[in-house]
């Protein structure tokens, strides 16, 4: 057949139209105008991306111990926004707000005490850590839980509670002088000159009544846990409301022994002391375990940063282990049938380590821990901090966000168990949350087929929502449940929709393994319905994969995970996509070809559309 040229006006780009060969039927082909997110400004470490569609976990907001809350108070001017709090200084806490969980606008100090001559200022003197905030509709108040070290006191990491009418603050310490009692039985209101008494002045602002908490600890056999203090010293508070009952709970981490504790709250200012419970102990799979039995916690004395997530009638505790200064700081998960447990830490075969920098495998991220988990637009996300310096770790950290998916695994008894799986930590380009970009991943709506599938593999892995990430942590779980679609050679993957869909971008995620990775996408074809009602196949040849960004050295030694070849374009109406990929050559990726089981593998395909 003869080829013919036709000119189309498409986004001010000349389009070439060809007559298709085969089947005796003419078909219009239009070369597509697109952007692949791989353009670099001079001297830039990161490519320029369309931030209306995508994000990347760059260093945007320096903050440690992030807590993110949704503003659900309809009276508030920021209703529908998200607020971010964290460890930001000695005497107070800065906060930010966002509409997309990625781009944060500074609001100001939610809590700040500069005058150290006042009791409040002295109480919040140094080492103000890990604020968490919650809104209470009944009281119409926002409450902040945190710890700080009082001025001129022998005690450190004192737990405090503050309140505000707004998530932006100002939060003010709540004064309990009329109701609290010192551990020696003296009511605080009866202590003379309490404002200048360095042993007592700060106790009026504490989260817990000193005497009642002391008695609760004694009941648990923990009266002598801290020989250096007569009041509880604690950090990393987490207020939580059970969605099924409306009951309130408060979790925290003891500064001695690093136990995670939990208790029921009658209100956010009135604990139910008799419910105080040990939730987790470093190294022990359950609080009642007779000896240490968690392999990945044998060399750590840290369990901290509790967060509770409900799912399927169970309660999931996420917590961090190891030193926050180390690359190995990571998030783990445990499960229970009740808010106060008993919680059982998941084994690595069950996915016990949720988020880890995997020091032997990652050169692009470090110290991923102290997380919040929230549901936004129907998708769960984990918000965590990572080190600013990958090489040195330390105290300087920034906020990052990745998706959480739920997968079903077999527990140690062979029973089905839902567990969290993190699509991260990532430093690669990822799609913005749907509620922010207005485009969702519709790939799972398509009927998927492919040529050249390797024995034992399946196209179902291409649209399961799970990004494959090379991990030593949870290695058995990842190898068992997080699958890539493997091919014995060149493949054409077809996604066929039951009707025309509005599509804005395509993401083809590479293999986690260098030996089965692709170098680029040979061709992508979109069967489209044009604005004038006619039909054409729009195509892209040689869609780039940003090999520069996703390899660790010039020798292409390590492939960074959850990375994709991306094409974004003006909206099209499309009912079928065909993606042709060929295995990389030794010249393109020198380590390619090590794997005898699969020459080529693809982790995931995402189609951003409506």
Q: Model-predicted segments: where are they?
A:
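Bacterial N-terminal signal peptides that target proteins for export
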Residues: 1-9
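Bacterial N-terminal signal peptides
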Residues: 11-17
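C-terminal motif of bacterial Sec signal peptides marking the signal peptidase cleavage site
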Residues: 19-22
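Beta-rich carbohydrate-recognition and catalytic domains
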Residues: 24-128, 134-236, 241-298, 312-315, ...
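Extracellular and analogous surface-interaction loops
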Residues: 69, 74-75, 240-241, 265, ...
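Non-cytosolic beta-sandwich-type ligand-binding/adhesion modules
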Residues: 98, 160-166, 328-338, 346, ...
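Predominantly extracellular/luminal regions of secreted and cell-surface proteins
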Residues: 262-268, 435-472
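Aromatic, loop-rich ligand-recognition surfaces of beta-strand-rich domains
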Residues: 473-537, 561-610
